Every structure is written in C-alpha cells, then in structure tokens.
C-alpha cells in the first residue's frame, strides 16, 4: 500500500476509535463509513459483497461476545469481517480456542498477520484475505461478526447451509434478520449514550 494511503487509513481508524467513546454505535458506524470511504479502495466500496466499514470493537465487547458464546479450548472460532484481528486474537489468547478470521482488506490482513507472528500464535490463529461469500466456514463451532443487517441477511442462508447443528453465532449490535435470538446482552459504553448489543444464536 502506498505510504500516503497507509497514513490516511491510520488517521481514519484513529478517529473512529476516538469517536467510539462519545458516539452511539449507530453514530460511530456512520462516522466510520464516511471516514473509510475516503481511504478504502474504490473496488471494495463498489463491490456488491462489501459488508461495511471496519469499526474497532472495544476489548470489553470482544470478551463479552466470546463469553456469550461460551468459547473454550475445544472451539474453532470464525470471525466474519475480522478487521485488525482483535476477536480471533482474543479467542486464542484469552479463551484458548483456535480461530480463523476472514477479511478482504489487505492492510488489515497484514496487520493481523503481524500480530499473530508477534504473539506466537501461528499454530492456532490464521487470517484469510478474501470474500466471505467465497469461503467455507463449515469447520466452525462458533461464528462471530460485526456486520450490517443487509450483510447478515445475505449471509444467513449460507451459514444455515454450511454450519453444523449446535454451532453458536454471535452478532454484534444488529440482530440477524429472520433468526430466533437465543440470548441478548447489552453492554454500556464509556459514555452515557454509548451501548453495545450482542445477540446469540444457535444453528438448529
């Protein structure tokens, strides 16, 4: 990636992270989309399978999502739209699970790969750069994602076909259209107006 684009991506993501402490998730999502549209490639933004902007999820929300799914050492966690890898790294580091991230942004994949190597997690964590709609997620025992509702709507039938009975699915902030919520958890953000919703599902 060209140095100027790397700089712009860093500035945009820093702005989004700062906004998380003062905005609601909906406001932060809008801010992120406006910021990242200036730096994400035209090819990505115009692609019909673009799932939405990368919005950094706070560590407390990451842990809560994995706890809600009762992730443990026998699990294989797939994170759809894994961003900078914070969920798949946490799954391995703090929950002793194996994990796979799927992300098509090259810069974010490179950042994740660097973190995996730095933390010595090569045997338990990997990131795949590619289109989620082209991937096989059938090995997963847990699936997580922070996606737009329209993206979940398109992914839902794919997950229903590929995932085995009993697999847990956690959606951050938006419910999956047409799916029955098994459990919902709300977390308060750092500001009075910020909150995060987690939705747990189980494949039947």
Would you name each region that the model predicts?
Residues 6-15:
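Bacterial N-terminal signal peptides
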Residues 20-75, 105-139:
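S-adenosyl-L-methionine
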Residues 74-83:
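Conserved class I S-adenosyl-L-methionine
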Residues 85-89:
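Glycine-rich SAM-binding Motif I of class I
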Residues 98-103:
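Conserved SAM-binding motif I beta-strand of class I
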Residues 138-154:
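A short SAM/SAH-binding and catalytic strip from SAM-dependent methyltransferases
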Residues 150-204:
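C-terminal substrate-binding/active-site "lid" region of AdoMet-derived donor-dependent transferases
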